[in-house]
């Protein structure tokens, strides 16, 4: 048996749902999707869900992962085994841990490949900071996986599809985290997972002000702007949501233009699936050139304006 009888899908990030649903279609005979509202439920059915389970009644001061109890109860009530697919977001991983405990299931995070043989999941994911690929065969009846972005293709909606909708009512957990306040994040983030062209800057750009040069290039060629982890986490020059690497974004654009990025393995794990990699770095020995299809050795601050002018013609 090369599929599970049932798969259970939930995504706290709506943009990740089409990819998870495509994976579900390949891995199971029946697809169950947990959603937070009617609109997401309608989308899930168009993407292939046979059954939609609307999570209902969570107080505003409680976290999404507090649904773990009723989600696990629902899963157990409908089969003695099954596969659970979640996105590898922060909330997704927190929910995965809670479900793993309640289902007595093995949990595997950041899966980049998933297959099924004899009713058991085999999962591959990065280990040792991206230096190697680890493979795990999950032996527990239930398997809970968080899926890296780009693992599956995106499912296409079909308005002719039909499915059944059910309601799952909130049950307060015995121990819960209560949200006491929220603060809006200042962010101009975009969905980089869908970008065809990406210009990504590293600390070699020199300063926060010089990022404007990369932004001008993005406007000229219709690209989206990303960065390396040090730019976001250490220098605080850009938003956390834009950094590429093993612990955040895993991209597969047609073009990845790396500007002032050294090319350490932790970063390249998030970019080396790009169709074409173009590197600009003043260090001719930078590791990025080992991955690049094309490269320019030189000062990015001088090269970017010239490149922008040439491509804008």
Curated annotation (Swiss-Prot):
InterPro entries (alphabetical): DHS-like_NAD/FAD-binding_dom, ETF_a/b_N, ETF_a/FixB, ETF_asu_C, ETF_asu_C_CS, FixB, Rossmann-like_a/b/a_fold
GO term, biological process aspect, one: carnitine metabolic process
The keyword Transcription belongs to this UniProt entry's keyword annotation: no
Pathway linked to the protein: Amine and polyamine metabolism; carnitine metabolism
Swiss-Prot/TrEMBL keywords: Electron transport, FAD, Flavoprotein, Transport
GO molecular function: electron transfer activity; flavin adenine dinucleotide binding
Keyword hit for Nucleotide-binding: no
Protein family: Belongs to the ETF alpha-subunit/FixB family.
Subunit structure: Heterodimer of FixA and FixB.
Job of this protein: Required for anaerobic carnitine reduction. May bring reductant to CaiA.
Protein name: Protein FixB
Natural source organism: Escherichia coli O6:K15:H31 (strain 536 / UPEC)
């Amino acid at each position: 048996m090369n599929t599970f009888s049932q798969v259970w899908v939930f995504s706290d990030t709506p943009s990740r749902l089409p990819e998870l649903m495509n994976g579900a279609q390949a891995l199971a005979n029946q697809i169950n999707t947990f959603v937070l509202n009617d609109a997401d439920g309608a989308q899930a059915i168009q993407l292939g869900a046979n059954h939609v389970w609307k999570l209902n009644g969570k107080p505003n001061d409680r976290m999404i992962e507090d649904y773990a109890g009723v989600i696990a109860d629902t899963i157990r009530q409908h089969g003695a085994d099954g596969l659970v697919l979640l996105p590898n977001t922060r909330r997704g991983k927190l929910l995965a841990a809670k479900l793993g405990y309640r289902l007595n299931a093995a949990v595997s995070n950041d899966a980049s490949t998933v297959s099924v043989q004899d009713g058991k999941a085999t999962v591959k994911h990065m280990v040792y900071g991206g230096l190697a690929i680890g493979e795990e065969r999950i032996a527990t009846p239930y398997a809970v996986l968080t899926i890296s972005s780009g693992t599956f293709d995106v499912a296409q909606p079909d308005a002719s599809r039909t499915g059944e909708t059910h309601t799952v009512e909130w049950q307060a957990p015995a121990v819960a985290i209560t949200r006491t306040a929220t603060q809006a994040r200042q962010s101009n983030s975009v969905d980089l997972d869908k970008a065809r062209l990406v210009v990504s800057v590293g600390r070699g750009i020199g300063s926060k002000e010089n990022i404007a040069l990369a932004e001008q290039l993005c406007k000229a060629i219709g690209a989206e702007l990303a960065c390396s982890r040090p730019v976001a986490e250490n220098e605080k020059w850009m938003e956390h949501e834009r950094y590429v690497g093993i612990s955040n974004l895993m991209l597969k654009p047609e073009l990845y233009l790396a500007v002032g990025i050294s090319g350490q393995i932790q970063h390249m794990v998030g970019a080396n699936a790009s169709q074409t990699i173009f590197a600009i770095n003043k260090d001719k020995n930078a590791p990025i050139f080992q991955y690049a299809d094309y490269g320019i050795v030189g000062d990015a601050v001088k090269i970017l304006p010239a490149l922008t002018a040439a491509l804008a013609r």
